[in-house]
Amino acid sequence: MRVILNFRPQNAVKRWERCMNLDWADNQSYSEILLIGFLVCLWWSFMTSLSYAQITPQGRDQTYKQAAPDRFEERFKKQEFPKSQLVPVKPDNLKPVFPAEMRKVNFLLQRMVIKGSTIYGKRQFSRLFREYLHKRINLEQVYIIAQEITNMYRNDGYILSKAVVPPQKIEEGVVQIDVIEGFIDRVAIQGQVRGPRQLLNEYRKALLKSRPLKALDLERYLLLVDDLPGVSVKSVLTPSKFKQGATNLTLILDNKSYDGSFGVDNRGTKFNGPIQINAGMSGNALFKNYERIGLQGVVTSNTDELRFFSGFYEQPVSSEGTKLFFSGSFSDSEPGSTLKDFEVAGESKTFTIRLTHPFIRSRSENLNGFVSYTNRDTETLILGELDSEDRLRIVNLGVSYDFVDKYKGINLVSFNLSKGFDIFDSTETGSEQLTRSSGHSDFTKVSGEALRLQQLAPSWMLLGALSWQYSFEKLLASEEFGVGGAQYGRAYDSSEITGDQGLAFKLELQKAFQPNKKYFKDLQLYTFFDYGKVWNRLPTSTGSTGENLSSLGLGIRFNVTDVISGYMEWDKPLNQEVSSEGNKDGRVFFSLSARF
């Protein structure tokens, strides 16, 4: 009853207000909790997506092997081929035939006099007739000795020299043989001269100075003329009507003002390609200095993925074949496929100056040396941030030697020494953001190639080739040895595996056919096996220090006309999956090009 009597309206209102204040406070706290939870979820989602977008070490390695532009120059480098060629030589089955009456002229040989030789001495000649001295011989044997002297000159390369038996009266057993040492007396030039005549005059003087004329001198200077940009030369030798032993040489020049090419292939990758379109153009002696100026461009069907442009200038600087060569290239790339999400973008600029000299130049043997300096700057961005920057300054010394041997094999051996220097604003060893964190910009490495093309039968050939590299330090990405692509590891993408050291070889059996049809000139069937292995001085992102791959395949090369050519081949990876494909399925590659 007291509880009821104590009820007052004012107390009820106060209790209601306290309840309302409590609910409002609880709602405010609840809203704050929801807001904090929302922000936490948003942050977690952002961090999750960010961590998802971070490129893995394996993905970064693949980028620098196959998609970054610092490997494009190696990818599009043309293979070096031997200049030597098999020269058909007809066996000399025709022995000189002398009249039978010569055998009837007999006499006692007391002394033999050989006149006119400036090359050989008495001792070298005496071995040819020593056995006949103080014996009775006939006139035919004297002519045989003269022929042996001629053969001695010819075998030593004096192609215009010969020995003759002059008319004489043999008295007291003394016989005379005259040697006529042949030489070039006049050099005439037919056709348009598109460069400095002084250069051709230097070649002319060198040929006139070769007395007696050696085949090596004649070959060397004719080939050096033929090596001039856009020039092809034919030569005609005619005996002089006025001088004994003299020969006149006529050079017939044919000139081509420009060379061009256009081609398409599928040798790209999923990241840059796979369809590649290339075009090139070069002008010959445009400034009348026997210089060559050229441009080349390569793009993919999606031009953002790969753009590669290069140019060069080549200039003869001596009459002995020395040439100065300037070249530059620019490439950039925004790889697609699985690398697109990582916004990879790269750029590379290269400048090279090279001096080359042919120490030996002939149809069957060539020795070339060169010295060069290369300036290469590359940078790669990932997710819009600078991931790597290399600036390399490299000096190269190299030599290549090719020759034909007696077993009808054409051989090529090359050796190259490369040395990096920390000069001219290069990125020094130990700098941040290098393509390989422990890579050396002041590296030293040696590399080389060997090739042999062996004729097995008139239409069968066996090709064997080897490429290698050894480095004394850990290298940056552009200087690594790569396996994969059109030369070695043909079933794999370009630079499928790379390393500081490497070795690769291939064997290819070839069979040639010549249909000689109007629109199908010739073709070649071939089958091959190749293998390559690389080693790294430090473990890679996968923890390994070495990788290897092998493949085999078969294909056909063809010349539709003198202008259009191409190939198609089926290649099978053997021991390792193609990284961009994720399998070891067979692959088909093709190329079609036109040269004009």
Residue ranges and their predicted role:
Residues 281, 558, 584-596:
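Outer-membrane beta-barrel "beta-signal"
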Residues 304-405:
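Transmembrane beta-barrel wall of Gram-negative outer-membrane proteins
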